[in-house]
């Protein structure tokens, strides 16, 4: 289980991250995607504050373009920030951009907003546009389509993450 750290000032994000760790969370989902250079600084400050034992996931919220994504993710890799994955770095429809990124970085890329249906999952997996698939029941239309996506991913050896959209 992860907890989301909303994009904010570096100091506020570090404070929110430390608070989450104090409450027992060991996986933080860091929201970024507004300012590339500043995004790297945010992640670096959080990593320094929480230490190496806490998993960091980065959600760019479709906020970067493909080349910018490669530069930012490469910078995080070069700094040894040990990011578990980067979620949806580019616009949902930009599967060429996703593939461009996936081919050029070592950090796993998670498709989220790009996957609404089993057909989307097949296309993303076969094209090499992502390393991982994020499934949200509200987004996929319920448990049955979500299970189909899981089955498809399993056939291709692709891991899935199950998330939510704060539905009630």
What spans do the regions from the language model cover?
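Active-site beta->alpha loop and helix N-cap motifs at the rims of alpha/beta catalytic domains
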Residues: 3-19, 36, 40
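Alpha-helix N-cap/helix-start and coil->helix boundary motif
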Residues: 10, 167-168
């Amino acid at each position: 289980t992860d907890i989301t750290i909303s994009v904010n000032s570096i100091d506020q994000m570090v404070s929110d991250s430390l608070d989450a760790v104090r409450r027992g969370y060991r996986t933080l989902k860091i929201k970024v995607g507004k300012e590339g250079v500043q995004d790297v600084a945010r992640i670096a400050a959080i990593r320094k504050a929480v230490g190496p034992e806490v998993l960091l996931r980065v959600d760019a919220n479709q906020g970067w373009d493909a080349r910018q994504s490669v530069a930012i993710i490469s910078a995080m890799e070069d700094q040894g920030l040990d990011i578990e994955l980067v979620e949806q770095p580019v616009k949902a429809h930009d599967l060429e951009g996703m593939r461009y990124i996936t081919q050029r970085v070592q950090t796993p890329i998670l498709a989220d907003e790009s996957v609404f249906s089993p057909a989307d999952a097949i296309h993303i997996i076969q094209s090499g546009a992502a390393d991982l698939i994020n499934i949200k029941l509200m987004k996929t239309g319920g448990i049955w389509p979500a299970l189909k996506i899981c089955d498809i991913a399993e056939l291709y050896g692709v891991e899935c993450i199950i998330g939510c959209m704060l539905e009630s």
